[in-house]
Amino acid sequence: MYTHQKNSITAGVPVAEAKKAVIFIHGRGSSAEDILSLNNHLGIKDAAFFAPQATNNSWYPYSFMAPVKENQPALDSALGLIKELVAEIENAGILQDQIYFVGFSQGACLTLEYITRNAGKYGGAVAFTGGLIGKEINMQNYKGNFKQTPVLITTGDPDPHVPVSRVETSKGILEKMNAMVSLKIYPGKLHTISKQEILLAKEIVFDSNQLR
């Protein structure tokens, strides 16, 4: 088992000068560099970009549908790393409602798990193929009010790693916590991020907030 060390790469506007911040969370077997390249396609202006790097290129060792204890201590370490990064961004002067999250696959699961455990008014979140973590959902972990934070969740049907049923359950939980969730299911989509998903993320989460 393993934990994570603080190791993020950055791009975009320096955080001290930025109006917003975007945290990109990579998938299993990928890297911070890979996920950070999405910023070139999302067209986000006046933003500081952050991408933390997981130990062993994996935020937790087993499936997100495994019992939570089997993914410890890596999972708690990953959640703590994201929380520390958010605190640093806020300390630099960026308000919570100008902080955004983008994750793919394992990173999408971690994105949803983090924001739902720490619900508040964020700028927005995009989960490309992901759902809340655990063999069973523990509602005691989830507290707060999203205050209409826009959240986009996408997935393929079927997806080899992420059951559509868990994606739909996750959507319902976030909505009960007052998130404004958009879910898009693509029949037969490969386990990748498509051009259509990027355009949808721009439309639902980023373009509508450029003038805020």
Predicted segment positions?
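Short beta-strand/loop motif that positions the catalytic acidic residue
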Residues: 152-155, 159
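Conserved hydrolase catalytic core segment
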Residues: 113-124
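Serine-hydrolase catalytic machinery in alpha/beta-hydrolase-like enzymes
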Residues: 2-96
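C-terminal catalytic histidine-bearing segment of alpha/beta-hydrolase fold enzymes
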Residues: 168-212
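Gly/Ala-rich beta-loop-alpha elbow adjacent to hydrolase catalytic centers
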Residues: 102-107, 111
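Active-site nucleophile loop of the alpha/beta-hydrolase fold
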Residues: 52-55, 126-134
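Short alpha-helix in the alpha/beta-hydrolase fold that links the catalytic acid
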Residues: 35-38, 139, 163-173
